[in-house]
């Protein structure tokens, strides 16, 4: 973790599972809280929680979006990683593509901002404003939010779901499955309950 929050002291007592009513309440509460912190309209955006990391969440975006993803912005380590990942996801370009960029490239300290894109905000949120009208915005529980590591946070514009693979496709990287489970306050995989508690 970096930024002003360099140390995290946590003592957590978890006495419920990820399928418990307490977790469902925690999940729904955290959804509302994160949308408020992000300043995103709950009628226009959904928020998903993915056990793992911000990097895994970005990989899930590449896996889930139907069209190819072009990486734009300043060069740097994460620009190169996402470009490589994009090249490893061959998709038909006949119907267009979507742009993705890293808002704060930590390898060189450069920032980039463009509206109406997919945004890697893992190292920028919440100290940098979310760019205007993002299709998807990805961050994580640790880094600048200062909670325990292990939870990716993905905001998706509701009108963008038509660009996402069906929830019928079984994969732990399928964002649509996280949306389906999120409606009932759960995740499709075992959730890191302690991280949810600490983030709240």
Kindly give the residue locations of the regions a language model identified.
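Gly/Ser/Thr-rich loops at beta-strand to alpha-helix junctions
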Residues: 2, 51-57, 74-79, 105-107, ...
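Short, well-ordered beta-strand core segments
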Residues: 99, 117, 137, 152-154
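Active-site C-terminal subdomain of aminotransferase-like
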Residues: 3, 142-200
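Buried hydrophobic positions in well-ordered alpha/beta secondary-structure cores of metabolic enzymes
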Residues: 11-12, 54, 86, 120, ...
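Active-site phosphate-binding strand-loop segment of PLP-dependent enzymes
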Residues: 90-127
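PLP-dependent aminotransferase-like
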Residues: 56, 63-99
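Conserved N-terminal alpha-helix of the aminotransferase class I/II PLP-enzyme fold
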Residues: 10-60, 77
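Conserved active-site segment immediately N-terminal to the catalytic lysine
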Residues: 131-142
